[in-house]
Every structure is written in C-alpha cells, then in structure tokens.
Amino acid sequence: MMFNNENYKDYDQELWEAIQAEEDRQEHNIELIASENMVSKAVMQAQGSVLTNKYAEGYPSKRYYGGTEYVDIVESLAIERAKKLFGAAYANVQPHSGSQANAAAYMALINAGDTVLGMDLAAGGHLTHGSPVNFSGKTYQFVGYTVDKETEKLDYAAILKQAKAVQPKLIVAGASAYSRQIDFEQFRFIADQVGAYLMVDMAHIAGLVAAGLHQNPVPYAHIVTSTTHKTLRGPRGGLLLTNDEAIARKMNAAIFPGLQGGPLEHVIAAKAVAFKEALDPAFTDYARAVIANTAAMAEVFAKDDRFRLISGGTDNHLFLVDVTKVIENGKLAQALLDEVNITLNKNAIPFETLSPFKTSGIRIGCAAITSRGMGVDESRTIAHLIIKALVNHQQPEILEEVRYEVRRLTDAFPLYKKN
C-alpha cells in the first residue's frame, strides 16, 4: 500500500503543532545552554534523507546486508573527513551519542571493575566519567579528581599525586562544565607515569579543537571521544578517534557488535556535512567568535560583585557563575530566566554546598548565539539582561522589560526564519 500522508502537517496535526512551537521557541529564545547549538539547513536536510530507510550493520565494505554500496560512500566520507579534521589515523562515526562513544572507549581499553581516574561531576566532569548513578560508575571503580580550591583550576601536580596513589588503569580527561584550557600533554605525562591509558572526552570543545583554538588531544590520548553537536555544530551523535591500529580494532568491535546494531546512516550523513563545514576556513572564524563572545559575556559578570565567576574567567565556549548572592539557587535562576526567554541550566560549582537538584551556579555557553550571528556587543547586552532579571526577580514589570529586549535581539538575528 502506497503512502497517502506525504505531508506530516496534514497527516499529524498534533505533532506538527508541537514541532512548530519548538521552532518558534528556538527563534525567539536566547539559547545559552553550553551543550546546545544550531545546525545548518544542510545538516538537517542530510539527516532527513532517504538514508533513514537503510539498515547497514557492520562497517564500509564489511556489511551484513546487501544494497549498502551507497551508504558505504556516505559513511566513508564521514570517516575521512573526521580523520582530516582532527588529524587522526582512525575514526568511528557510528556512535549514537557521546555516552555510547565513552562506553565503547571503556570497553576497548579496560575491564569491568578496573580503577579509573576521572573528573568529579561537581568539579566539571560528566555523568559518564564515573557518576555512581551512571553505567560508568556502576561498571568500573572510578576515583574522582577535582580542581584546586583556591583557583578552581586543574592542578596537574595534585592529579599526578592522586594517580600514583590509586594506580588507575585509565585516566579520563575532559569536562562538561570546565571553563579553562585542558593540557592533554600533561595528562598523557601523568598517565605514562602510572602505566595507564589516557582517554580524552572532548565533546564540549571539539569545535574549538577542529579550529585549532584548543590543544588537540589526538596526539596524546589513546582514544578520543566526542559528540558531534555542541561546538562542532553537527547533528546529535558521537565520534571515536585514535592513532593506534590495535585500539582502533577494539573500539570498532566495542561499537559493533558490542554496543550497537545498525548505524544511523542518515545521522552519519549529517555528520559528514558538519565535518565538511568545520573544514571550511569560515568555521575557524566562527570558533574565534564563540570564544570572544564568551569572554565578553563573562567579563560583565566578573565586574559585578553580586556574582562570582568560577575560576575567575573562561578560555573556551562556557563559564559558570555563582548566583547565590542575588537569588536562592541555580534552579530558581534557570526557571526565572526561562520566563524571560533566556535558556540556560543550573549547574553545580566546585565544592558545591547545595543539592545537585538546586545548585549554587548556572552554566552559560555562547556557541548557539554565535551561530545566529550575534557578536561581542550582543553578548554583553545579554549578560546585562541576565543580571537585570536575576537582581529584580521579584519585580514583574522589570522582567517584562527584559522579555521585550530579548525579543528585539532575537528578531534582529533570526535563526531559520527571515524577517
């Protein structure tokens, strides 16, 4: 029976309305969640292609199904572009997410029950770096390293001392809420001192690495994992990289057949488009603008003694702010800013004293507003609007003023719609 529902707007009105509402939200909200970005229409078109119909267990030229000659071309393009982008000898573009990429890296390098040294979640790490509620913390014996209490930056001497004490089989470098450059060469030195593997999760900074604006972990890590969205500005998905042939075989086997079945070739096609975009010199300009916008926004908070900028600043696409002098906690700050169409997230800060469901801080990222074309001036304006809303959170008329200014900004920098 042939389809008679070619237009989903007519066929599924409820779904269409929900998607239209989300499109409107994205158009008229200022997006500051550090793990989010805005993809190009080319990326969306590739992801919405007929490749969604094709099952392709295995890898290019080694499939378990027929009719894969064209998806082999697509996946090979994505692999070669990823290798070129990050200077890696081997790449796997099949992980459905960054979490699955991390799971595959663990499977490739260590065994269940082995000791792993990873960044503590409260210090800026990720759930998959050993949180007890996550598969990583349930499967492996994670020990968390943190930041220096005074500087709130990584203390490599302290991490080396801790590594010598716990003798991990694997050290995980990388973060989801750390605003400073990470020295991967130092991490490799530490790993070598204790005979451990080094895994780098560069999910948040992959776009900055691709642009040459952050040290590339590929020459230092045994395995590098990443997402393909965030600063890389591709579809939601994962990526694995290595320069070691033996490890490449293990990581590929960990993804398939270890963790996944058929790859999502339509998403892989979108990854290929995003990698091509990131190879364009214009992407470096974009990444530079992300860093400049983030620094400009952070500076506004740094100059206001009602707020505390964690670690005193930022080197990348994000920063953390302690908001407890002006509002009870980060959860309330997040909810309040949602009301004025500014989207960000509550976030624990180093040595957090509040519940992770409340937190003392908020996390702010500038990748998405930069994709809209906003610059340093707009970034400073947004910072002032956030401060105005938080300081006056019990004054509805002022919150309405902020909401109006947010709408003026988003109208001036449309995302997909044209004014």
Swiss-Prot record:
Protein biosynthesis in keyword set: no
A GO cellular-component term linked to this record: cytosol
Subcellular location: Cytoplasm
Enzyme class, spelled out: transferase
SUPFAM superfamilies named in the record: PLP-dependent transferases
A UniProt-annotated Pfam family: SHMT
Molecular-function annotations in GO: glycine hydroxymethyltransferase activity; pyridoxal phosphate binding
Pathway in which this enzyme or protein is active: One-carbon metabolism; tetrahydrofolate interconversion; Amino-acid biosynthesis; glycine biosynthesis; glycine from L-serine: step 1/1
InterPro entries reported in the protein's UniProt record: PyrdxlP-dep_Trfase (IPR015424), PyrdxlP-dep_Trfase_major (IPR015421), PyrdxlP-dep_Trfase_small (IPR015422), Ser_HO-MeTrfase (IPR001085), Ser_HO-MeTrfase-like (IPR049943), Ser_HO-MeTrfase_PLP_BS (IPR019798), SHMT-like_dom (IPR039429)
Family named by the database record: Belongs to the SHMT family.
Subunit structure of this chain's protein: Homodimer.
Name of the protein this chain belongs to: Serine hydroxymethyltransferase
Underlying gene: glyA
